[in-house]
Structures are given as structure tokens and as C-alpha cells.
Amino acid sequence: MNLETLRQERRKWLTWKNIVPYQEAIKALPEYDDVEVSLGDVVDIQIADLSHKDAEQIRETALLMKPWRKGPFRINDLFIDSEWQSQIKYNLLEPHFDLKGKVVGDIGCNNGYYLFRMLSQKPEKLIGFDPSAIYYSQFRFLEHFIKSDIVYELLGVEHVEFYEHKFDTLFCLGVLYHRSDPVAMLKSLFKGLNKGGELILDTFMIDGEGEMCLTPRDRYSKIPNIYFVPTVNALKNWCLRAGFESVEVLEIMKTDLNEQRKTEWIDTQSLEDFLDPDDPEKTVEGYPAPKRVYIKAIKKA
């Protein structure tokens, strides 16, 4: 697969009618020399001596790019209160990985929140994959101030195995249930890892000891493209069949209204609207409410 040809084709996405305003707004932003970035729960960008005019321009640019799914971010006094409190997931996972000096990929990286957080561990390379011109634009907006060495590819999980180099650690958070062939996806990730490499993944799950999965008829939690929601044992089997040597369950956690909620930065429905109003243990379709399993799968050294 010729990824460079694909890159050139996908750069044309940035000329789409709905995306051009984002690109123009980013280009119009002033350059700032004195910027301090803190990579905590809130990715905090502080620009010295920011004028009221510039602050307003930054605010209007951020508002233009709604919805903001992942975050939160702060730019001086502007707080981007994203739909997801992404620090909850990151802080849950961080004790389970060491990225120093490693080549790291984040599949389905959205606007780069996790990538920015990972900078503090000083990996050798950080590469994000997400075939979304909107999320890429949000990343470029933030990167205008942060100026990191992160590479953002408008590519998907199916391209990882063909990438120019392999990875020591791959993150794939909230992607697997969107794929109609989860084992094929896991095989692609497996091929993209170096020997001894690790995959850190989360996905929706259902309770039970059996090796089975829920297959929604149409939608799950109002999401149309959810194909398989496995038990933990079924997920382990998928990973082993994809070639991984071992699978460790890091955490199981129900998604709650603190982690995912509607804010002024999304203008759409959120988790509260996806659950049965009479029984929050179920989705509006009658399925078990969203619960996630977090795993680490290891490729044999």
C-alpha cells in the first residue's frame, strides 16, 4: 500500500467546503513566542501578554471547531470543557505504561488530547492516526501554540500495518466496536507492533463468563456503527486469535455522567440522552448501559 499517495489524497480533505474555514482561521492566528504549556489533567496553554483582541480571536476559532469531544484544554482564560473528561481514562491507564524512548502510536487520536499528555513521558516518536479533517483541524489549532513534534496522520487503523516503521506501543481507545471485523483489526495492530510490543486498548463490553458478544440490531446507545460488544473472555480470544501472546485486563469501568456529559462545547446529545430515562442501567434500546474494559495485549518478543 502506497501511504504517500493516500496522504496526498487525504490532504485534499482540508479543501472541503466545511473544513476550509477552520484552516483559514488557524492561519490567521498570530504567532506567539512566550508560551508555557502544562500537560496535566487540563492541557493548559498560557500565552504571555495576550491582548483582549487576540484572546477573542482564539475563542472564536475554538468555538468554530465545535464539537470538542476530547479534552479538557485551557488557553489563558478560555476553558474548552469537552464532552469527555478524558483525564479520567488517561489517569486510569498511565500507571500501566512507560513510553520513554519508545515509538508510540495512538489510533483514533481525535484532537490529540492523549498524545499531548504522553509528551511528558518523553517518547522517541508520537504519531496519531485519525481519518477526520475536523479532529485534525482541532489538533492543528492546539499545536499552533504547543509546537510539539507529534505527527498527525489522516489515516485509519487499517493503515497501521503498512506504516513506514513499527511501533513499541500502540493505543487504540474506543475504536474496536466500530469495526465489523474486530479480529482483522487486531491482526493489523499486531502486525504494526515491534516484537515485544504492547497494545493498550479499550472497548465496550458486556458482563458474563461466556465467550460471546452482543450484536446490536441497529444502534447501541444511539450510536449506529457498533458491531460487536464482547464479554471479557471473548475479547481475550479475539486478541489471542490475532496473534498476541498474552492479554492482561487493566480495569473494568462503567461510563458515568461525570466522564461523558453535554457541555456548551458540543451542541449535541451526550450519555444522559443515550440511557433509558426510567432505568439508567440500560440504553434507550434496552441493552446493558455502556461499560468498558481496558486491556494490555503483548506481542511475543
Swiss-Prot record:
Listed EC numbers: 2.5.1.-
Catalysed reaction, written as an equation: carboxy-S-adenosyl-L-methionine + 5-hydroxyuridine(34) in tRNA = 5-carboxymethoxyuridine(34) in tRNA + S-adenosyl-L-homocysteine + H(+)
Signal sequence interval, chain numbering: none
Biological process terms in GO annotation: tRNA wobble uridine modification
GO molecular function annotations of the record: transferase activity, transferring alkyl or aryl (other than methyl) groups
Matching InterPro entries: CmoB (IPR010017), Mo5U34_MeTrfas-like (IPR027555), SAM-dependent_MTases_sf (IPR029063)
Binding site for carboxy-S-adenosyl-L-methionine: 70, 84, 89, 108, 130-132, 157-158, 177, 292
Class of the enzyme per the UniProt entry, highest EC level: transferase
Record keywords, A-Z: Transferase, tRNA processing
Domain of life: Bacteria
Function: Catalyzes carboxymethyl transfer from carboxy-S-adenosyl-L-methionine (Cx-SAM) to 5-hydroxyuridine (ho5U) to form 5-carboxymethoxyuridine (cmo5U) at position 34 in tRNAs.
Subunit structure as annotated in this protein's UniProt entry: Homotetramer.
Family: Belongs to the class I-like SAM-binding methyltransferase superfamily. CmoB family.
Name of the protein in question: tRNA U34 carboxymethyltransferase
Species of the source: Sulfurovum sp. (strain NBC37-1)
